[in-house]
A protein has these predicted regions:
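Charge-rich interaction segments
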Residues: 173-179
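A glycine-rich phosphate-binding loop feature that marks nucleotide/adenosyl-phosphate handling sites
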Residues: 126-139
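Signature for HUH/AEP ssDNA processing cores
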Residues: 1-87, 94-110
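Single conserved hydrophobic/aromatic residue that forms the stacking wall/gate
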Residues: 180-185
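Helical (often loop-to-helix) elements that flank the catalytic cores of nucleotide-handling enzymes
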Residues: 53-74, 95-122, 142-173
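Flexible loop/turn segments at secondary-structure boundaries
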Residues: 89-90, 143
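Alpha-helix initiation and N-capping motif
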Residues: 4, 65, 130-133, 162
Length: 185
């Protein structure tokens, strides 16, 4: 892991955006959903502030964190890992075992559905995208002229069991019958 961290730091110091994949892949070189083998977390992307072209609902980090806290309390989810990206937050609930993507999809879609139902304003394209890449803590978000540090904001709870998340998220929905792919306002 130390070697990966040093490499990420080097790329970031040289002006590159640095990301990591959330899934494992069957074959190297293809970051397509069809090439994803397993997933080991549920996650959200919540934007705030002025860097998003007026498409966000939260003005400040504090407002976004407050909405996330309310959502977790209402659903009964544990405190997630939270990474501050300099213009949003990425949240992670690690799972106690890897899931094949077809096992993971219903949980991810149900999490997305609950966010919408409970008015937690997320980037809905992210939550159920098994080929998604997100920012690496310890690097910099360099999308704008202002370099913003990507950092671990809160270390969440230990990995949760898949059974726990199935219970808390409720009956999984069929991803093929649901089209929730655009951000809602």
């Amino acid at each position: 892991m130390e070697e990966v961290s040093v490499t990420a730091d080097d790329f970031s110091a040289n002006g590159y955006e640095v990301y990591f994949a959330l899934g494992t892949f069957i074959e190297a070189g293809s970051r397509e959903q069809t090439n994803v083998e397993q997933m080991r977390s549920l996650y959200l992307d919540i934007d705030y502030g002025p860097h998003h072209g007026g498409l966000v609902q939260y003005e400040t980090l504090e407002e976004a964190l407050g909405a996330l806290k309310t959502f977790c309390k209402d659903i009964g989810l544990p405190k997630p890992y939270i990474v501050s990206t300099g213009g949003g937050i990425h949240t992670y609930w690690p799972l106690d075992k890897p899931l094949d993507k077809e096992e993971w999809y219903p949980l991810a879609y149900q999490l997305k559905n609950l966010c919408i139902e409970h008015h937690l304003y997320i980037d809905t394209k992210v939550t159920a995208d098994c080929a998604r890449i997100l920012r690496v803590p310890g690097t910099y978000n360099q999308k704008t002229d202002e370099k913003r540090e990507v950092k671990l904001f809160y270390a969440g709870t230990a990995p949760g069991s898949v059974e726990f998340f199935k219970e808390k998220l409720g009956e999984p929905i069929d991803r093929k019958s649901t089209r929730l792919n655009s951000s809602h306002t």
